[in-house]
């Protein structure tokens, strides 16, 4: 478990920490009884290095699973190119056994799959059909615009793989094939997580006549304010810039594609801390952001805790943070490049992914009512005042405002 479950070792099983397949089947059954649909996270740009495919792939150069992954010869004792990983450091890992490098755009324990291989693609499609046969209602496709790479693997400017591994040359071919092989004529929802996607590309992915996806998660509004050290460097931005981005996507996909609307997810800081005010105007700014989200055209996505106004957390010790992105960025920027500890910690407080990953705050009992045991990461200390129980019977609460917003959105769309 190197990246909180995004390093998958078995596509047809449930991660131990979350229970068993029997538990999942019961969850699906009970949700469907209540007219709640379940969308699965589909992570098929990469697997875990503990997946049986990769274990076989690294055994020898002529193994039948070798071409399930991206293996390349080095250049003069160096990696095949200068691409950097999303999680800091090089995107290539040397394998002593076969004396070649494998590509990992994320952690070295997350080797990239080789979508150029039709046999690999068919394995993916079979797995997707298996989940649909179980009755799941759709897929959120993790970094799905990374699956097609420029097969020349050229160097990127300052190690940036984006122009060569995002929205690549065969991406539309692969998604159309997936639609035909798996998704066609089924009542499903499909949303692609797509860092770096433009409005023009968004229309190609979600257009009515395109036969690819229902909608995409774009990141443009999430990347606003990035500075010299990316998101770890707090930079001021104008409200008009945020409005410009949101308007661009609203107008750009109108009458053709479809927007997914979100402020929060497991990779982003808490919206009331990021774009609102988590102190004096906590209640009002959280409601303002909810109004903005629900009054745009598209499908709103609400992340756990957003509906009660959960805020960012500021743990004093680096050791209290669990996210591989945070820990690797600290190693790269502070230990190797000399950025100050204080500056980096402020960046973590502002934009770190663990802000979104502290346990849900149900009530004011120990650990926010999340568990009687020891939570995997500390609870935000403000759970005493910000929790579901505190808000559920308060008509003026953020929670009840979200409920009313959802009802209003449903009425408008019916």
Predicted segments, located by residue:
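Active-site and adjacent substrate-binding regions of carbohydrate-active enzymes
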Residues: 1-410, 414
């Amino acid at each position: 478990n190197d990246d909180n479950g995004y390093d998958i070792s078995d596509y047809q099983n449930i991660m131990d920490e979350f229970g068993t397949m029997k538990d999942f089947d019961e969850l699906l059954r009970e949700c469907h009884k209540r007219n709640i649909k379940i969308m699965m996270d589909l992570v098929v740009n990469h697997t875990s290095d503990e997946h049986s495919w990769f274990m076989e792939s690294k055994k020898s150069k002529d193994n039948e699973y070798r071409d399930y992954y991206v293996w390349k010869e080095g250049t003069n004792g160096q990696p095949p190119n200068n691409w950097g990983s999303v999680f800091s450091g090089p995107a290539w890992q040397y394998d002593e056994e076969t004396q070649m490098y494998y590509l990992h755009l994320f952690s070295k324990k997350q080797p990239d799959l080789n979508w150029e291989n039709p046999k690999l693609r068919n394995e993916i499609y079979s797995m997707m059909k298996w989940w649909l046969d179980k009755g799941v209602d759709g897929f959120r496709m993790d970094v799905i615009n990374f699956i097609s790479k420029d097969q020349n693997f050229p160097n990127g400017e300052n190690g940036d793989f984006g122009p060569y591994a995002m929205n690549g040359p065969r991406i539309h071919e692969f998604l159309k094939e997936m639609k035909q092989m798996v998704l066609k004529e089924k009542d499903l929802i499909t949303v692609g997580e797509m860092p770096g996607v433009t409005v023009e590309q968004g229309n190609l992915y979600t257009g009515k006549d395109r036969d690819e996806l229902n909608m995409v998660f774009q990141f443009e509004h999430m990347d606003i304010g990035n500075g010299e050290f990316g998101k770890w460097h707090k930079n001021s931005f104008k409200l008009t810039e945020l409005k410009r981005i949101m308007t661009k996507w609203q107008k750009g996909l109108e009458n053709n594609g479809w927007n997914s609307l979100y402020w929060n997810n497991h990779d982003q800081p808490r919206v009331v801390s990021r774009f609102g005010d988590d102190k004096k105007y906590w209640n009002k700014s959280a409601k303002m952001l909810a109004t903005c989200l629900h009054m745009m055209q598209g499908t709103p996505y609400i992340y756990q805790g957003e509906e009660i106004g959960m805020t960012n957390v500021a743990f004093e010790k680096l050791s209290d943070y669990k996210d591989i992105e945070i820990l690797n960025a600290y190693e790269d920027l502070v230990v190797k490049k000399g950025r100050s500890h204080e500056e980096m910690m402020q960046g973590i407080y502002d934009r770190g992914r663990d802000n979104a990953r502290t346990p849900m705050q149900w009530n004011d009992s120990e650990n926010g009512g999340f568990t009687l045991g020891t939570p995997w990461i500390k609870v935000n200390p403000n759970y005493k005042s910000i929790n579901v129980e505190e808000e559920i019977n308060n008509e003026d609460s953020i929670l009840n405002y979200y409920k009313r917003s959802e009802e209003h959105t449903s009425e408008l769309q019916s």
